């Protein structure tokens, strides 16, 4: 997966890895205003779980991809194609990623509002 993506994204540590690797989207953010969060939220529109965002902290705009050892080659190839599509979208239509996800029940929440005013319990409707 890392080898398929390194022609598109900057790999933070281009070394042999076991199953996880880190991408840095610093250049993508600087040149196209697309952040690691934008790409992660875009994953949701393609039905894949987003990678870990902003970790490790020493990598700017980090995305940590950690496919499990049980993933098939086909599913890894499909994930690579999705990340390549997201990269191309970042170059050609960054606003689409700024609004992602659009195909989910809950679209992009206001992260600052959610952090400042968390709702920690669900309020059931009265019957």
Report each predicted region and the residues it spans.
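Non-catalytic terminal extensions of PLP-dependent enzymes
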Residues: 1-127
């Amino acid at each position: 997966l890392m080898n398929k993506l390194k022609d598109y994204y900057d790999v933070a540590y281009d070394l042999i890895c076991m199953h996880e690797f880190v991408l840095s989207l610093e250049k993508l953010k600087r040149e196209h205003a697309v952040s690691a969060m934008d790409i992660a939220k875009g994953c949701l529109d393609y039905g894949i779980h987003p990678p870990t965002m902003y970790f490790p902290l020493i990598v700017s705009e980090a995305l940590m991809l950690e496919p499990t050892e049980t993933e098939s080659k086909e599913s890894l190839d499909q994930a690579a194609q999705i990340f390549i599509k997201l990269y191309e979208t970042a170059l050609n239509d960054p606003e689409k990623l700024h609004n992602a996800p659009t195909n989910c029940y809950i679209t992009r929440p206001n992260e600052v509002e959610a952090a400042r005013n968390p709702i920690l319990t669900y309020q059931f409707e009265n019957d």
